[in-house]
Amino acid sequence: MVNDLTPHFEDVQAHYDLSDDFFRLFLDPTQTYSCAHFEREDMTLEEAQIAKIDLALGKLGLQPGMTLLDIGCGWGATMRRAIAQYDVNVVGLTLSKNQAAHVQKSFDEMDTPRDRRVLLAGWEQFNEPVDRIVSIGAFEHFGHDRHADFFARAHKILPPDGVLLLHTITGLTRQQMVDHGLPLTLWLARFLKFIATEIFPGGQPPTIEMVEEQSAKTGFTLTRRQSLQPHYARTLDLWAEALQEHKSEAIAIQSEEVYERYMKYLTGCAKLFRVGYIDVNQFTLAK
């Protein structure tokens, strides 16, 4: 266990508080910034993002009146979908000021009797009991040294029949790359350093084994693991295409340097998923 459980506000805000207008140039209308799920070949990105959200929510066993905690809630699409489809109360946690403001505004505009809150806070600061937990694309930012604490906190605030749906990018150890026949190239080393320093400071994707072992130690039972690897390559391709189509606007909102950096990130990550250096998995963890 680590002693300093202060959320990584600066690391997260360095990326996610760049500019909502900039992200809107390449994200779908739901502003979902994670892997989509293309159930059908003819799906639009928006349809595939909603399908991914439905895939995650469908694994939780939600019932009307339950309270769902969304850790790393982004711009709120998962919570709004949960209210609409499952009639549940929601609490969202984000470390991004821009996201918190966006979610609060969208909540204020909703016509529903269900409770809905968004907090500018990390899981480290949240101790309220909830019925279910979903976390999509946030675990990668926690750091390996906080995995045990995260699972302990999730286990503590869930009821005896509670479920945690963890959707996270997963990586390979150097030895696993060798075992899979993946070349350890200079490009790979440089690109991973670029991602860690210029795109997601503090980001540390876990291995599949890390998630399975740490969650089990806390008392969770893994009931299902589902890989969406090819879906993330396609998602990133579509983001890169959209950003390229809006190049002039992107440069006007930010700069040419930021535009080029994001194009390098999106196209490079698509390659990593396509070749198999990284994966993305949904872990269904029952208490």
Curated annotation (Swiss-Prot):
It is an enzyme of class 2 (transferase). The keyword Membrane does not apply. The modification N-acetylvaline is found at residue 2. S-adenosyl-L-methionine binds at residues 33-34, 72-74, 94-99, 123-124, 136. Pfam families: CMAS. One of its GO terms (cellular component) is plasma membrane. Pathway: Lipid metabolism; mycolic acid biosynthesis. GO terms for biological process: lipid biosynthetic process; methylation; mycolic acid biosynthetic process. The keyword Zinc does not apply. One of its GO terms (molecular function) is methyltransferase activity. It comes from the Bacteria. Inhibited by S-adenosyl-N-decyl-aminoethyl (SADAE) and thiacetazone (TAC). Keywords: Acetylation, Lipid biosynthesis, Lipid metabolism, Methyltransferase, S-adenosyl-L-methionine, Transferase. Its EC number is 2.1.1.79. Disruption phenotype: Disruption of this gene suppresses a cyclopropane group at the distal position of alpha mycolic acid. Mutant produces fully cyclopropanated methoxymycolates, but the efficiency of cis-methoxymycolate cyclopropanation is reduced, leading to accumulation of unsaturated methoxymycolate derivatives. Cis/trans ratios in purified ketomycolates are unchanged. Cells lacking both cmaA2 and mmaA2 genes cannot cis cyclopropanate methoxymycolates or ketomycolates. It catalyses: a 1-acyl-2-(9Z)-enoyl-sn-glycero-3-phospholipid + S-adenosyl-L-methionine = a 1-acyl-2-(9-cyclopronane)-acyl-sn-glycero-3-phospholipid + S-adenosyl-L-homocysteine + H(+). The active site is at residue 269. Belongs to the CFA/CMAS family. Catalyzes the conversion of a double bond to a cis cyclopropane ring at the distal position of an alpha mycolic acid via the transfer of a methylene group from S-adenosyl-L-methionine. MmaA2 also catalyzes the biosynthesis of the cis-cyclopropanated methoxymycolates. Cyclopropanated mycolic acids are key factors participating in cell envelope permeability, host immunomodulation and persistence. This is Cyclopropane mycolic acid synthase MmaA2. It comes from Mycobacterium tuberculosis (strain ATCC 25618 / H37Rv). The gene is mmaA2.
